[in-house]
């Protein structure tokens, strides 16, 4: 969708769960806008802060020394009010009150749904995919995934060390309520014996128990299970496995550490380009768009198109993850 109104003031907000690299996107958006002669404003605490008019002017200095920092300097929050027509109208009215005629929204599907509503109310919006879950269908990359999956991988390596020393079975629970990309990638990168994903919910716990017993018979000193939070129940699963196998079994829930930490080079670079690209789209007169990375290029899609498609698990990656497991070694 295009607009004929020239954008003069752009607001930037981060919404929903934080993701490493968000600061790189904020920095890029602010500096690109200032370079193009646009006034830049930061909206604190996402849509909730927008409702409460927590809006600040942003200068190039305000985003200095932020590219290497995890989290988001604009803070973030979830906002139930933004799901209501009254809340959406209030958000649009606040934008107009503060002269914000363009909005960069960094977040996931829920954040984009809010941006879509604001676009319908006359506020030019562009979404930037920021979520560690990698669950936005229109893009091959989302800000934060690379850092989160590396954080999880390094943690699982450490758990493996102690698991081997004590000849234990270890269940490591990673983030991914509805999408198992962190679990899948870590399962491959860490050489896990079993991977449990929300997309493959019909797993057979007895088969896992049988694998553990058989692998121990073959001399395997540890057994690593990477479990997505969408499956969950890692602690109770560990108790059942230990009772059935007689092998000490421990659960480790990585939790919010996956959201923190200094972003990787990949997250910094991709986020920087996406943040700048979002501003460029607004200045080109585009609205109701989402920035994406597809087939080696930075592109943009209509928000409605981005929200209408559910991302599917890459079956070949799943097949290879299972094929390379020790469970299938003869």
Mark where each language-model region is.
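Catalytic, metal-anchored helix/loop core of enzyme active sites in primary metabolism
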Residues: 247, 257-272, 279-283
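Short, ordered loop/turn segments at secondary-structure junctions
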Residues: 15-18, 43-49, 78-79, 108-110, ...
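N-terminal phosphate-binding or glycine-rich loops at protein starts, especially the Walker A/P-loop
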Residues: 2-51
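Accessory alpha-helical/coil subdomains and C-terminal extensions
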Residues: 105-107, 117, 124, 145-248, ...
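Short glycine/serine/threonine-rich phosphate/pyrophosphate-binding segments
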Residues: 18-29, 51, 85-89, 102-116, ...
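Phosphate-binding loop/pocket of nucleotide- and phosphate-handling active sites
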Residues: 289-330
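Glycine-rich oxoanion-binding loops at beta->alpha junctions
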Residues: 2-3, 50-103, 110-111, 143-150, ...
């Amino acid at each position: 969708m295009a607009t004929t109104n020239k954008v003069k003031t752009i607001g930037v907000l981060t919404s929903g769960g934080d993701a490493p690299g968000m600061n790189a996107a904020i920095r890029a958006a602010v500096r690109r806008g200032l370079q193009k002669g646009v006034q830049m404003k930061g909206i604190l605490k996402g849509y909730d802060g927008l409702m409460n008019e927590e809006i600040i002017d942003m200068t190039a200095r305000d985003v200095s020394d932020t590219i290497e920092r995890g989290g988001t300097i604009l803070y973030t929050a979830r906002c139930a009010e933004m799901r209501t027509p009254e809340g959406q109208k209030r958000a649009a009215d606040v934008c107009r009150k503060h002269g914000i005629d363009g909005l960069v929204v960094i977040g996931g599907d829920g954040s984009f749904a809010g941006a879509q509503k604001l676009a319908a109310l006359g506020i030019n919006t562009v979404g930037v995919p920021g979520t560690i879950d990698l669950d936005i269908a229109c893009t091959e990359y989302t800000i934060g995934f690379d850092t989160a999956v590396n954080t999880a991988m390094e943690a699982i390596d450490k758990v493996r060390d102690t698991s081997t020393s004590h000849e234990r079975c270890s269940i490591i629970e990673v983030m991914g309520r509805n999408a198992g990309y962190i679990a899948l990638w870590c399962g491959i990168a860490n050489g896990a014996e079993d991977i449990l994903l929300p997309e493959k919910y019909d797993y057979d716990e007895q088969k896992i128990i049988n694998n553990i017993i058989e692998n121990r018979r073959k001399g395997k000193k540890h057994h690593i299970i990477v479990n997505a939070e969408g499956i969950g129940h890692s602690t109770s699963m560990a108790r059942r496995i230990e009772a059935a196998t007689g092998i000490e079994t421990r659960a480790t829930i990585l939790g919010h550490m996956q959201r923190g930490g200094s972003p990787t080079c990949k997250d910094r670079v991709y986020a920087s380009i996406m943040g700048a690209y979002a501003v460029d789209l607004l200045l080109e007169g585009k609205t109701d768009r989402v920035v994406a990375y597809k087939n080696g290029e930075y592109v943009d899609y209509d928000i409605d198109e981005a929200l209408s498609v559910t991302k599917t698990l890459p079956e070949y990656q799943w097949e290879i993850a299972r094929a390379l497991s020790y469970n299938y070694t003869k």
